[in-house]
C-alpha cells in the first residue's frame, strides 16, 4: 500500500465524515488495507489531517502551476485562480479540509504552524503572479504581498460560504465579487462580467487560456 493511496483515502473520509467522526478504520476501509497499515504512516488523527491537507493542497498548487504554463498573461492566471477556487472541480480543491484544519489550529499550535506554512505557499504564488503582471504593465502599482493576502482572505471567506451552499453566493457570484476587487486593487480590466470562462473551458481542457 503506497502512501499516496492512503492520503487520497484520508481526503475522501475527512471530506465525507469530518475530522471528529473519521476513524483510522474508516481510512483503512476506503484504502483497502488495515488500521495498523494506516497507523504505520500516521501516528495520530492530527497528523492524518495535516498530511491529508498537505496532499490535497499540493494537488491544487500543482494544478495551478500546470495551468499557468498555458496562460501567457498574469491577468489570465489570476482569473484562473479565482474561477478554479469558486467552481471546485474536485474534492481536493474545496475548503472542507481547510475548515477542519482551521478548527483544530485554534487550539493546537502544531496544527497552526502547519496551516500557516501551507497558506503562505499559496499567498506567495498569488503575489508572484501579481508582480509578473506589474512587470508586464498589466497591473498598476500596489503592495503585491498585501494584495495577495487580501485576495487569499477573500477567497477563503467566500469559499466557506460556497462550501455551505449559501443561497446568495452561487459560484459565478463569487467569481464576479473577487474579480471586481482585483480590478479595483490592481487598476486593471479583467472583464469581470465574463464569469463563465473557467467553467466552460474546464469541460474540455481546464488549462485552456481565456480568449
Model-predicted regions and their roles:
Residues 5, 9-47, 51:
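Helix-turn-helix
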Residues 12, 16, 44, 66, ...:
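Conserved amphipathic alpha-helical interaction elements at protein-protein interfaces in regulatory
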Residues 16-20, 71, 136:
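Short coil/turn segments at alpha/beta junctions that flank glycine-rich nucleotide-binding fingerprints
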Residues 47-49, 81-88, 113-120, 142:
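A ubiquitous short alpha-helical element
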Residues 51, 62-95, 147-151, 175, ...:
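Hydrophobic alpha-helical connector segments
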Residues 54-59:
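Short, basic, alpha-helical segments at the C-terminal edge of helix-turn-helix-like DNA-binding modules
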Residues 76-77, 90-113:
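Amphipathic alpha-helical segments used for helix-helix packing
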Residues 112-116, 120, 134-205, 210-211:
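Hydrophobic/aromatic-rich alpha-helical bundle segments in the mid-to-C-terminal region
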Amino acid at each position: 500500500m503506497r502512501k499516496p493511496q492512503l492520503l487520497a483515502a484520508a481526503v475522501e473520509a475527512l471530506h465525507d465524515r469530518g475530522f471528529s467522526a473519521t476513524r483510522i478504520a474508516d481510512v483503512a476501509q476506503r484504502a483497502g488495507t488495515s488500521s495498523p497499515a494506516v497507523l504505520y504512516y500516521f501516528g495520530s488523527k492530527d497528523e492524518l489531517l495535516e498530511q491529508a491537507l498537505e496532499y490535497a493542497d499540493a494537488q491544487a498548487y500543482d494544478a495551478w502551476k500546470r495551468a499557468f504554463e498555458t496562460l501567457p498573461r498574469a491577468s489570465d492566471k489570476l482569473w484562473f485562480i479565482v474561477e478554479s477556487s469558486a467552481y471546485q472541480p474536485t474534492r481536493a480543491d474545496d475548503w472542507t479540509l481547510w475548515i477542519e484544519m482551521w478548527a483544530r489550529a485554534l487550539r493546537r499550535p502544531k496544527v497552526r504552524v502547519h496551516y500557516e506554512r501551507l497558506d503562505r505557499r499559496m499567498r506567495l504564488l498569488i503575489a508572484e503572479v501579481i508582480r509578473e503582471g506589474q512587470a508586464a504593465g498589466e497591473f498598476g502599482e500596489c503592495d503585491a504581498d498585501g494584495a495577495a493576502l487580501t485576495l487569499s482572505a477573500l477567497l477563503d471567506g467566500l469559499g466557506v460560504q460556497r462550501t455551505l451552499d449559501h443561497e446568495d453566493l452561487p459560484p459565478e457570484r463569487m467569481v464576479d465579487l473577487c474579480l471586481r476587487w482585483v480590478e479595483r486593487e490592481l487598476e486593471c480590466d479583467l472583464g469581470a462580467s465574463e464569469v463563465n470562462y473557467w467553467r466552460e473551458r474546464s469541460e474540455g481542457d481546464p488549462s485552456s487560456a481565456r480568449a
